[in-house]
């Protein structure tokens, strides 16, 4: 049995970075990945990626992807601090919150190796500026607002790494408690 508690607004925030109708169907949602004592919530559309993770997970390793449809049913909790418990049941995964459990089948597919793409805070960035798509950057503002960080939603630290490498997108106060750590990247515009 898998049991992990996840704030609803974290899943809804990351949904802003997930595509709506991607041919690579396994990207159409938010991945929950537990590996080696760390649990990560990840979403990407191939141009932007965001991850909230924490390192005090003590359960078994697992991976599942919540579809956009499943996340849509959680939207009634937007703006509320509601924790859900994820169980691996006989009928699929079950999210249990204040209401009855939402039973869903995880998307059948393997989420890309996001750790290969995300840079840690200590990564050596070269500082060379890159041109960025303002619409893609605005997705991070939507993420911050959904996380409840409305006052400084547009304040993100961009760590440039040249015109052909991903740019780190960081916000040290992305979550109120600091229990979950934010990592993000955005790809620069191609000339």
Regions found by a protein language model. Give the residues of each.
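DNA polymerase processivity clamps
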Residues: 1-191
């Amino acid at each position: 049995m898998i049991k992990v508690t996840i704030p609803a607004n974290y899943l809804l925030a990351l949904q802003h970075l997930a595509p709506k109708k991607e041919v690579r169907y396994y990207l159409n949602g938010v991945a929950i990945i537990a590996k080696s004592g760390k649990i990560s919530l990840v979403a990407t559309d191939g141009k932007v990626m965001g991850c909230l993770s924490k390192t005090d997970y003590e359960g078994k390793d697992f991976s599942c992807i919540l579809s956009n449809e499943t996340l849509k049913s959680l939207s009634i909790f937007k703006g509320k601090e509601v924790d859900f418990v994820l169980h691996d049941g006989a009928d699929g995964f079950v999210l249990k919150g204040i209401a009855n459990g939402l039973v869903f089948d995880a998307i059948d597919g393997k989420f890309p190796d996001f750790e290969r793409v995300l840079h840690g805070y200590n990564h050596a960035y070269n500082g060379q500026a890159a041109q960025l798509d303002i619409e893609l950057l605005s997705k991070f503002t939507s993420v911050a607002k959904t996380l409840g960080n409305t006052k400084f939603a547009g304040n993100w630290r961009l760590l440039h790494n040249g015109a052909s490498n991903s740019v780190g997108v960081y916000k040290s106060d992305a979550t109120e408690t600091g229990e979950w750590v934010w990592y993000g990247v955005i790809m620069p515009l191609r000339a």
